């Protein structure tokens, strides 16, 4: 993410950078993690107090698209190694959709450098080798950036960290597949498998699905990411295919049209909702009617869900929602105005 002074003539001349130059010497790059080293950035933030929140998670990781280079700059593989954009991407002989080089959509992207994991990947991942839990991207580059009414992978390569998730509100990679589990559940497995300390987390993070918590009481960006992941095939295969529509319905009258759109798209991926009629820019009354209609469809599907008696999903013994607990989460929804600038 670059910055320019409006007084400069960059609109006519552009940036001074030319291929082969030192980019940092010619183009100011906003890096919140280096605030102390960038006095010019401190001045900019003072004049634009919402700037960082519009683009970054609280710890400085990007939360929107179009700024993937920022993620690379914060990645140890780049800082301590030779990783660059072209380590994975190619301008030629690639799919224009993602411009990934040959086989870079697979674990080869990481194993080309981290070759020691190739022989016994499951020993590292603790998941079956062919499962989504053994896909390097899913753990180390989860979909935590909002983009084009969807979610895309973070380009800051890191590892699941419950303490960071609790502190920043950024979804944890483990919970994005295991959408039916709590943050505490993740902390216990990371401790068992990788000896990561178990941090103290809020009561809700001990008892309720982490994704569900973001969906119901997160800010608009968190709600959109949570909704997208409830419709993500990799998540549904792990977390079930039945409980999600009841909670996606809660977003059909969300204050943000973008959130409503993402929720609707996820909802249509579930059985019984493929032809669900809905206009995400309809009147408030129509949005509320659609929400009620979705709830009725879900309830008519029956209560013999595999997820019945799942307190972390707010479901009682009969597979119905604990309405009081649901409302308590909705009452805590973060309605702080937010704009995620891609």
Enumerate the predicted regions with their spans.
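Structural detector for tandem alpha-solenoid helical repeats, activating at a conserved register
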Residues: 221-222, 243, 258
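Amphipathic alpha-helical scaffolding segments comprising HEAT/armadillo-like alpha-solenoid repeats
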Residues: 204-212, 238-252, 273-281
